[in-house]
Amino acid sequence: FDLDGGVLQWRDDAVKPAADMLVSALRVQTRGLSWPVRAPMPFEGSAQLDQTVIGIRGTATDTAAQAELSLGDIPLGRFAPYISSALKPALAGKLNAGGRLEWQAAQGDRPMALQLLSARVDVNELKLGPPRQPLASLKRLLVEDLRVDLVQRSADMGNLTLTQPQMRVQREADGAWMFEPWLVAAPNPAAPATPQPWRVGLAALQLTE
């Protein structure tokens, strides 16, 4: 199976402003297709989001899959409709990432498993607010050996490196911190929801100049 030159249009009206993205140059290649599945099927795919290259390569069956993912440099402004639901000031910077995704279907008493392993997230020239006088900035944010369990809702970082973090910390006379006006107030849900909270772990933190 070989798909070449595909186009995918993504629009999300649930956020304001609406998110509108165009994925082009979509290519998917697979070998050894069969049903029932007799052996892991190798696959490979690539696409472009604006000028950003997205890649995936792995193997899959009807009950399990694993894939190496890669995301080239992409401006954070591309995700502004989603970021603005949590932060009022604009967030600028460039993100690239990679990692291994593993999935296993539920079988018997064993629940479904979906994990991102050995992941790396690299954000450069991070600025919050006006570009010339940002409210906060970071030359580089690097997360290494990131492990995310999407079913168990946990994230463990092997190493977090922050390069040249800059932010003025201030508390107002009324006791409010300077960052409180930056945050968008969460809407009151119609009915209280109690999802399992996320657990986040960090093995090592480095601050560098």
Name each region found by the language model:
Residues 84, 127-129, 133, 137, ...:
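A cross-kingdom feature marking solvent-exposed beta-strand/loop segments within repeated
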Residues 118-121, 125-127:
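Surface-exposed extracellular loop regions of Gram-negative outer-membrane beta-barrel proteins
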Residues 108-110:
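Single-stranded nucleic-acid-binding OB-fold domains
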Residues 9, 128, 149, 167-168:
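Extracellular beta-strand scaffolds
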Residues 1-85, 91, 98, 112, ...:
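Elongated, acidic membrane-bridging lipid-handling scaffolds
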